[in-house]
Structures are given as C-alpha cells and as structure tokens.
Amino acid sequence: MAGVTRGKDGAVGILTLNEPESLNAMTPDLLGALGEAVGEMTADPAVRALVLTGAGRGFCSGQNLKASEALGQDLVGGVMKFYWPTFKALRECRVPVVVAV
C-alpha cells in the first residue's frame, strides 16, 4: 500500500516516503499521497519547514517501472496527470522544503 508517513519535530514537518520494499519507487498512488501530505502539512500554521525523506535503505529509486503502464501511451500526458500536481505542491509550498537523502 502506497503511503507517506507524517510527523512533526517542533515547527518542522517530516514526510517520509514509506515504500521501502521498492526503495520508495514512485507510483501514481505514492505521488498522490505525497501531494496530499504536503498540502496537509503546509495548512498547519505551526509548520515552518518540511523535511522529505525515505524509509528503508534508499530515498527514492525513481519511477516504479511496474507502475509505468498507468502513464499510458501518452507519456507527457501521464507525467502531467500524475507528477505535475505533486511537483506544483512542492514548488508552491509556503515553507522551505529540505530533502534528506
């Protein structure tokens, strides 16, 4: 099951990609969960920074090739549908985002 765990350490929100069996490889579900988690964390006025990290022995191994069929034949359209909302949420985040690799 795709997931992103959420935590806080003082004013720092901590988001952890939690698919260690695939080295946190990106899937549409994981991307959606990440975008949702970014939105939830940044809606909290007490959060002044975000740290994004990965569970297990790797931060993120890239695109999960087994899930690539969800992108369909139109690769650009697939990227826009699944990746762009999450990238946009990170880019427009009101607080600094630090990636702990």
What is each residue range found by the language model?
Residues 1-55:
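Conserved CoA-thioester-binding segment of acyl-CoA-metabolizing enzymes
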Residues 22-23, 70-72, 97:
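A short, structure-level motif marking secondary-structure boundaries and short turns
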Residues 26, 65, 101:
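Hydrophobic pocket-lining residues within nucleotide cofactor-binding pockets
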Residues 39, 54-89:
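Glycine- (often His-adjacent) and acidic-residue-rich active-site loop
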Residues 50-51, 59, 98:
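Hydrophobic beta-strand anchors of alpha/beta hydrolase catalytic cores
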Residues 86-101:
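Glycine-rich beta-to-alpha active-site loop
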